[in-house]
Amino acid sequence: MHAAPIPQDAAPIIAADRAHVWHHLSQHKPYETSDPRVFVEGRGMRLWDATGREFLDATSGGVWTVNLGYGRKDVVEAVAAQLLALPYYAGAAGTVPGARYAEALIAKMPGLSRVYYSNSGSEANEKVYKMVRQISHRHHGGRKGKILFRERDYHGTTIAALATSGQAQRAEHYGPFPDGFVSVPHCLEYRAQWDCANYGERAADAIEEVILREGPDSIGCLVLEPITAGGGVIVPPAGYWEKVSHICRKYNILLHLDEVVCGLGRTGAWFGYQHYGIQPDFVTMAKGVAAGYAAISCTVTTEAVFELFKDAPSDPLCHFRDISTFGGCTAGPAAALETLRIIEEEGLLQNTAQMGERLLANLRDLAERHAVIGDVRGKGLFCGAELVADRRTKEPLAEAKVQAVVADCAAQGVLIGATNRSIPGLNTTLCLAPALIASEAEIDRITETIDAALRRLAA
C-alpha cells in the first residue's frame, strides 16, 4: 500500500492556504470556519490530502485534465531533461520539442497542418477569434467577422471567450462584452426545444436559421464543442454533425471545434470530432495535451487558413501579429510528446472506449434503480447523469441536492463532479471523467459510490 508523504504538521500549510490563496470557482466564506482541501500527492487515480485522507479521483484533476493519472515518472523525466537542455525560447523561433510534437500531432489529424502554441484553452480559442477577425479585415473587406457559438457550450474565461459563453452564469457580471458574437440553440434532445423526428438535423437547421437572420456574408466562424462539457455532457444527436458541416461549407463559414475537454483520447478517439467524420478548419485543445504535467494549448488549422496570412509578405500587417509568452516554454511540448507516446503504447484509446462502455452501462443500471436519474449520456470516459425531481416532467433536482450527492461521494472517498454555475436552475448533471488508465474495479467503485449516495438522498 502506497504511503503518501503527509506533512508531520499540516496545520501551517492549511493556514497559509487559507490566508493567502484565492481558489478558483470558490466561495471562501466557509473557509473562515472550516479548512480548505489541500492535496499533497497523487498516484494513478488516487489522491491524498494534507490530512492523510485518500480519494479515488473520478474527475481527472477536477477539470478533465490528468488523463494519464498521477505520478507518471516517464513524463516528469522527459520534461526535466528538456528543461535542462533548453527551457524556453519565444515562439517567434522554433524548438526541438515544439517541432517534434507538431509533427506527431498533425499525424493524428488528417486535413490539418499547422500548430500554434499557447498556454490555456481560453487562449487557444481566442487565437482562432483573432485569426477570423484578421481574415475578415484583410480578405473580406471587414465582412464575415461575426462568430457563432452554441447555448450551453463554454470556451474560456477571458472576456472575448466569455462573449462566446453559452453558460449564462459563467458570463454574468463580466460584461459588457465585445460585439460580433451570436448564439445558436443547443442540441440537447433530453430538453428538446422542438417536437420532431430527426432531432439532430432540426438542431442543425436552427443554426442555419440564425445564419440567414444575421446574413451569411456577416459570419466568419462557428465555434462548437464536439461534446458539450460543463453545460451538461451533451452528445449531439444523430445527423447533427453531418448537417452542421454541410451548412458551414454552404455559407463559407469556418468550423472551429473546441476540443479542450474532448481532445487527446477523452472520448475514446484522438479527438471528439473524429467520431463523426467531419473536417474542421480549426481545432483547439489544452487539458489533455500534456495531461496536467505542463501548461500547453494548441490551435491547429489547415494550410488553406495558414496561407491567408502569407499573401502579402511586404505588408507589415499581413502576418498573424500575436504572441503568447509561455507558448515558448519547452516543458509543454516535451510533456505532450510523452503523453502521446503513452496513450499509443499503453492502448489508452481502446481502454477509454471499453471502460467508457462499462461506465455508461453502470450508470444506466443505476437509472433503473434510482428515479432521480433522468438521463444518462456520454462517450468514452466522458459521462454525465442528469438528476431530476420528477422523471415525467423532467423538473430539475434542486442544485443543493445535486451538490449533496457530490459531497456524499467525497465523504466516501470518491471525487466526482457536477455542472455548476453554468445554466441557471440546470446545474444538475453529475460529471464523471476518470483518467484514461481507469480499470474495471475503479469504474465499478465510482458507480457503487454514487449508488450509495443516491440511496441516502432518497432516504
Curated annotation (Swiss-Prot):
Instruction: Please provide one cellular component term from the Gene Ontology annotations of this protein.
Output: cytoplasm
Pathway assigned to this chain's UniProt record? Organosulfur degradation; taurine degradation via aerobic pathway; acetyl phosphate and sulfite from taurine: step 1/2
**Domain of life from the UniProt record:** Bacteria
- Give the matching InterPro entries: Aminotrans_3 (IPR005814), Aminotrans_3_PPA_site (IPR049704), PyrdxlP-dep_Trfase (IPR015424), PyrdxlP-dep_Trfase_major (IPR015421), PyrdxlP-dep_Trfase_small (IPR015422)
UniProt GO molecular function:
pyridoxal phosphate binding; taurine-pyruvate aminotransferase activity
Q: Which residues carry this modification: N6-(pyridoxal phosphate)lysine?
A: K287
Tell me the protein family, please.
Belongs to the class-III pyridoxal-phosphate-dependent aminotransferase family.
The free-text function statement in the UniProt record for this protein reads:
Catalyzes the degradation of taurine into alanine and sulfoacetaldehyde.
**Which protein is depicted?**
Taurine--pyruvate aminotransferase
Taxonomic source organism: Rhodobacter capsulatus (strain ATCC BAA-309 / NBRC 16581 / SB1003)
What gene does this protein come from?
tpa
